[in-house]
Swiss-Prot record:
Residues 78-88 have a biased composition (Basic residues). One of its GO terms (cellular component) is nucleus. The keyword rRNA processing does not apply. GO terms for molecular function: nucleic acid binding. The modification Phosphoserine is found at residue 96. This is Uncharacterized protein YHR127W. InterPro entries: RBD_domain_sf (IPR035979). It comes from the Eukaryota.
Length: 243
């Protein structure tokens, strides 16, 4: 009995002070971290190229990481380009190629319109010249009713008829001229030419400027025996044909 009491006393004395105050099973160990239980995450799946693969697959993870990197790279490049575009100095509208092309197109259209107008004006001018010449020719051919002569003496003047038919009868031609013009003819001479036509020289009995012009206007351009004849007033010295 005494031995047990001695042993119990030794055991009590051998304990530390903290062991004597707090039971051993209630002492929390200091400095020892509790092990956390690893929670196993649920495994997911992803679709790659039409196939269902595990989300924890290394290839899938690498592709996702590469996609994120590419996305960030594209965003940074777009931001960089946007900053360069904003910092770019504004060009003058006149220096733009599109403006230059439009301006050149406008100039070309203006030049084309001006060229067409010039060509039209040239044609109109040419047409007017032709009309004036035609009108002037008709006036010359038709003759004016007003006949003026500053020389009162027309004794040396006569009428020359060209492009008559070969072998025309002088007396018949004289009678026709007198009957139509009502002018007396003193002499008429006809000569056949090697060219195939005949020429007549007509001298009036009482030549005056008015009577000569009257006969010329009546017979100039007349159709005689199928030929269009011409009549001119000439001086006796200028008619060098021998009859």
């Amino acid at each position: 009995m005494a031995r047990n009491r001695t042993t119990s006393k030794k055991n009590v004395q051998s304990k530390r002070l903290i062991d004597r105050v707090v039971p051993m099973d209630k002492i929390k160990k200091v400095g020892v971290a509790k092990k956390k239980t690893v929670e196993h995450t649920k495994e997911g799946f992803s679709v790659v190229n039409g196939k269902l693969v595990s989300s924890n697959d290394v290839g899938v993870l690498l592709r996702e990481a590469q996609g994120a990197i590419d996305k960030r790279t594209n965003v940074s490049q777009r931001n960089r380009k946007k900053g360069i575009k904003n910092n770019r100095p504004h060009k003058d509208i006149n220096s733009s190629p599109d403006w230059g092309n439009a301006h050149r197109g406008t100039d070309w259209q203006s030049e084309k319109a001006n060229g067409m107008n010039r060509a039209k004006n040239s044609r109109n001018f040419t047409t007017n010249i032709k009309l004036q010449r035609q009108h002037f020719g008709e006036e010359i051919q038709g003759g004016s009713q007003l006949v003026i002569s500053t020389n009162s003496d027309a004794s040396d003047k006569l009428l020359m008829l060209f492009n008559l038919t070969l072998g025309v009868n002088q007396e018949n031609l004289k009678n026709v001229l007198e009957n139509i013009s009502q002018v007396q003819i003193a002499q008429i001479r006809v000569r056949d030419l090697p060219s195939g036509s005949a020429t007549a020289k007509v001298r009036l009995a009482y030549p005056t400027t008015q009577s000569l012009e009257k006969v010329r206007k009546l017979f100039h351009g007349a159709l005689v025996d199928g030929r269009r004849i011409q009549v001119v007033i000439a001086s006796d010295e200028s008619s060098h044909l021998s009859y």
